[in-house]
UniProtKB/Swiss-Prot annotation:
Residues 1-81 are annotated as: RNA-binding. GO terms for cellular component: host cell cytoplasm; host cytoskeleton. This is Non-structural protein 1. Residues 42-79 are annotated as: Zinc-binding domain. A motif (pLxIS motif) lies at residues 483-486.
């Protein structure tokens, strides 16, 4: 087990390039970090162990030892993890780059074998080759990869992933790309590698190679917002941001293939890039469709629909002295936009409900309460129209000129009044609302705060480092909004 980790340890002194590339956290002094009880393969050292969340992408793919290096497969520094990473589509040329990288960093020849024979402190006869002493030589070249599926984008991290584990909580799946290359050609490459090994190790090498190279591919798993860590989320002014650490270098390459070309033919450039790289901290916004769905589900769960039959004049989120309407604690760590949407939705529905239904106070039990929760849950789904129609029908609509309408004459605040006029594109609000107008107002309130058609599915921490740098230069990496604060001096003028 952990052949990749052992190979990184023993091969790191072979060349100057190896000294820089093969320094992994698993072979360094252990610095304790919290464990998340997620068992899987660390994609940096390839050992099967308990994982923790990465500083660069907030996904659980790094072990408690390698986390100290703060490396991510989305960095643009050409470290070993980055060199083993390719984005889809996977071509034969990209797979050849992986094979050439393995042969460069982990060669097997008589000179290497003799070097390890001198280094290894054997306790038996020098002529014997124990597997435990020469595990680093039992490194077969396989084309297995841990695949992260970010909706339409797939990222492959190639490595020697040994053993088996349940992948239920893992953000990636292990796939075998041998059929995209050439099965017989890969067999020949490994036969040539093992030809220099002693006979006692050849059988072990061959057994390990065929076992790993013939593994069936797992079905890819779509990454969702629930897969990301919440440990690096910060809440400033009721805006959620995510702290992301990435390794940067000033050197650029046109493609990952050109980077691998320099690893083989221009090692000085790679060494310079590694020695001049730096760790940069990004504070990215966390506004994405996955988080919005999670927040809306939580909001619908904690929603107090009793507010629509109450006589409270303040916004729904500010009610604190009523046992039936108090939700103030829910918004302690929730986005300010979610709170504003909740206030406007419930204020509008309260005005409609009080205008049409003879209801006493917020302690009464009404048939509309479950529909209010459903409306919040379905506010960004395709079922919103059905829910709006059901809610409209419980408000005792009457037929006027062949159309079902409800009365609308209850008091509302000025901000909501102006917003409804903008949605309906009218100068004065009508005293009766049709189903279309009722639905348009609800959708308009939701879309004002969250236009789901323009949101990304996943957080920005899944983007490549180059894109984060570009977004930061353009001022689009953080969520910006205006605070409408009146200046007392300007007001007096």
């Amino acid at each position: 087990m952990a052949t990749f980790k052992d190979a990184c340890f023993h091969y790191r002194k072979i060349t100057k390039l190896n000294r820089e590339l093969l320094r992994i956290g698993a072979n360094s002094v252990w610095i304790p970090v919290s464990s998340n009880k997620i068992k899987g393969w660390c994609i940096e050292c390839c050992q099967l162990t308990e994982l923790t969340f990465c500083h660069g992408c907030s996904l659980a793919h790094v072990c408690q030892w390698c986390i100290q290096n703060k490396r991510c497969f989305l960095d643009n520094e050409p470290h070993l993890l980055k060199l083993r990473t390719f984005e889809s589509p996977i071509t034969k040329e990209k797979l050849q780059c992986i094979i050439d990288l393995y042969n460069l960093l982990f060669p097997i020849n008589p000179g290497i074998i003799n070097r390890f024979k001198k280094i290894v402190n054997q306790r038996k006869c020098r002529n014997e080759f124990e597997q435990s002493w020469y595990n680093q030589l039992l490194f077969p070249i396989t084309l297995n990869a841990a695949v992260f599926k970010f909706h339409s984008r797939e990222v492959y991290v190639f490595g020697l992933y040994e053993g088996s584990s349940s992948c239920i909580n893992l953000p990636y799946r292990i796939v075998n790309c041998i059929d995209l290359y050439d099965r017989l050609l890969l067999d020949q490459i490994n036969f040539e590698r093992m030809s220099s090994l002693p006979a006692s190790l050849q059988s072990v090498y061959a057994n390990k190679y065929f076992k790993l190279s013939r593994l069936p591919s797992m079905k890819l798993k779509q990454i969702y917002y629930s897969d990301f860590s919440k440990q690096n989320l910060i809440n400033k002014c009721k805006i959620k941001s995510r702290i992301v650490l990435r390794n940067l270098t000033e050197f650029t390459w046109d493609s990952q293939i050109s980077l691998h070309y320099d690893v083989i033919n221009n090692r000085e450039k790679i060494l310079t890039a590694l020695s001049t790289s730096s760790l940069k901290r990004f504070e990215t916004h966390d506004l994405n469709l996955g988080r919005i769905k999670a927040d809306i589900f939580e909001l619908g769960h904690h929603c107090k629909p009793n507010f629509i039959s109450s006589n409270h004049w303040q916004p729904a989120s500010n009610v604190s002295q009523c046992r039936w309407c108090n939700v103030k604690y829910v918004f302690r760590n929730m986005d300010w936009k979610m709170e504003s949407m909740y206030n406007e939705l419930l204020s509008f529905i309260q005005a409609c409900y009080k205008s049409n239904v003879n209801v006493g106070n917020c302690s009464s039990i009404e048939n509309a309460y479950p529909l209010v929760k459903d409306m919040i849950w379905h506010s960004i789904t395709k079922y919103i129209d059905q829910t709006i129609e059901k809610l409209f029908n419980v408000m005792n609509p009457v037929e006027v000129d062949g159309q079902q309408v409800i009365s609308f004459h209850w008091q509302i605040d000025v901000a909501l009044y102006i917003h409804i006029k903008m949605i309906l594109k009218t100068e004065t609000l009508p005293f009766a609302l049709t189903l279309y107008q009722f639905g348009s107002i609800i959708k308009g309130i939701v879309n004002q705060w969250y236009d789901v058609t323009e949101l990304d599915y996943l957080p920005l921490c899944t983007e490549q480092t180059d894109k984060l740098v570009k977004l930061e230069e353009e001022g689009k990496i953080s969520e910006e909004y205006e605070l409408l604060i009146s200046d007392s001096e300007d007001d007096d003028q």
